[in-house]
Amino acid sequence: MSTPNSTPSEPPVNVSYYEQCKKELHEMIEKRQLLETSLIGLEDSIYRLEGSYLEKTSGTGNIIRGFEGLLKNNASNLRRRADYSESDRLFSLSSLSSPHTRSPAYDLDDSTETSRRRKRKNESDSHEGRRRSSFREL
């Protein structure tokens, strides 16, 4: 039976309960660290494999830039390699937890769509209160 000052859902406060909770917390922290390590390894693997794919297919075509180069199929396209930018890394840079998305080179890359949007917004804000209309508003 509960007393007027306590709620029925409160567990009894004692040392064994505290030790049990402390043990569970340490187990969860260890599990989280293992999962984070595994995630970093997977993201790094995706980054390397994606770079290899983009490098091998830059002359002929790939899923990022299209396959027009495959239709042309001349010798210069087949010899050309590594013609891609960091913003072409659609898969590895889509993860917010990837260490590659937090790199300064990615943040300062002006070729990304986000950077272009940011520039346009800053430019439109500097036009003395003039508002730029879009096709959706018409």
UniProtKB/Swiss-Prot annotation:
Residue ranges of the region described as Disordered: 93-138
Family named by the database record: Belongs to the EAF6 family.
One term under GO cellular component: Mst2 histone acetyltransferase complex
Quaternary assembly: Component of the NuA4 histone acetyltransferase complex. Component of the mst2 complex composed of at least eaf6, mst2, nto1, pdp3, ptf1, ptf2 and tfg3.
UniProt keyword Membrane, yes or no: no
Role: Component of the NuA4 histone acetyltransferase complex which is involved in transcriptional activation of selected genes principally by acetylation of nucleosomal histone H4 and H2A. The NuA4 complex is also involved in DNA repair. Component of the mst2 complex which is a highly specific H3 lysine 14 (H3K14) acetyltransferase that functions together with gcn5 to regulate global levels of H3K14 acetylation (H3K14ac), critical for DNA damage checkpoint activation.
Pfam family, one: NuA4
Record key words, sorted: Chromatin regulator, Coiled coil, DNA damage, DNA repair, Nucleus, Transcription, Transcription regulation
Primary subcellular site in the record, as a coarse category: nucleus
Coiled coil spans: 18-44
Signal peptide from the UniProt entry: none
Localization of this protein: Nucleus
Domain of life of the organism encoding this protein: Eukaryota
Compositional bias annotation for Basic residues: 129-138
Keyword Cell cycle: no
Protein's UniProt name: Chromatin modification-related protein eaf6
GO biological process: DNA repair; DNA repair-dependent chromatin remodeling
